[in-house]
């Protein structure tokens, strides 16, 4: 049981931690050469604008070959390239922005994330499968100081007002951070009882100051924010409703800066869902930093000691609507996909009401057993009391057995020493 559990975690974390191997298996830098194909079951080549994935049909190393039809890439389930059944490798070749791949910006890199899914289905009229379902995260990292394009970057000295008229898009990011908030979390694994530290950011370059808000967040077992089951973390234009329950989830006060917003979420997993992983999708938006927070643009947490809501900044009145669950008319439904809007020409004439929005996903967050939960250990290794009781029970059984044997032998001896005469 322990071996299969470790194999499951290895398949999920291959290339992300040192649980299975000291070096990542398929996390390659842009332009890096890939290792020998005979060593690894999955190889990834991050090219200038495309992603190439090569999967060995002996994916699990058991000799049981998988079928190419059972493999897909990304949330949009892109199919592999057509290949001969006799080939030992299944190949994918897609654009970096295809198949639903997500892009995040860190301090030093552009990160494109996706996953390889092996979902075996019964063949013909059979109702069984002989291989396991596996979801393998894949990342391509490109240094921000470099240029992934073959065309040179030309400097521009356009002021912000001109950039607004050019309808420039801003860059949003959502990252998992270490507990001290000083660095990005290296491993996506958590124990129940931990808190996930999330940091939302807006990258604006040298433009005028902007203030970032988390409008709403939802957790799902897949990268699709419309999947079921789901759990709402932030709602009603900035109310961190996850803190209403038995969780201590809250926004961090004060925020590091107007362009950054940090918050913690007590980790969880969906009941009756064997995947033990979640993805968190947040709808981020910005306003001008000089604009005061209001009911539509706020960051509010719930305080259990005072049984009230409080904001990261601004008047406490802007959080009162969190109690009613009605904080104004939403720009779009929380559960509907949203495409990043652009700065409009008409809105730029009145910049006080201009906002920019985007949906950003982070994950998977993978959950192990509870901290301090020794049920598995108790199941595997009996406690001292159990050992004593087991020993006493065995001693009683042995004693009763010996007593029965002695009684039988004694009766036979008595019968042999007093034979019954036929004449009598």
Curated annotation (Swiss-Prot):
The keyword Signal applies. Residues 409-424 are cytoplasmic. It is a single-pass type I membrane protein. The chain crosses the membrane at residues 388-408. InterPro entries: ZP-C (IPR055355), ZP-C_dom (IPR042235), ZP-N (IPR055356), ZP_chr (IPR048290), ZP_dom (IPR001507), ZP_dom_CS (IPR017977). Residues 351-424 form a propeptide. Residues 330-356 are annotated as: Disordered. Disulfide bonds join 46-140, 78-99, 217-282, 239-300. The modification Pyrrolidone carboxylic acid is found at residue 23. Glycans are attached at residues 125, 147, 156, 162-163, 272. Expressed in oocytes (at protein level). Residues 45-307 form the ZP domain. GO terms for molecular function: acrosin binding; carbohydrate binding; extracellular matrix structural constituent; identical protein binding; receptor ligand activity; structural constituent of egg coat. Residues 1-22 form the signal peptide. It is found in: Cell membrane. GO terms for biological process: binding of sperm to zona pellucida; blastocyst formation; egg coat formation; humoral immune response mediated by circulating immunoglobulin; negative regulation of binding of sperm to zona pellucida; negative regulation of DNA-templated transcription; oocyte development; positive regulation of acrosomal vesicle exocytosis. Keywords: Cell membrane, Cleavage on pair of basic residues, Disease variant, Disulfide bond, Extracellular matrix, Fertilization, Glycoprotein, Membrane, Pyrrolidone carboxylic acid, Receptor, Secreted, Signal, Transmembrane, Transmembrane helix. PANTHER family: ZONA PELLUCIDA SPERM-BINDING PROTEIN 3. Belongs to the ZP domain family. ZPC subfamily. This is Zona pellucida sperm-binding protein 3.
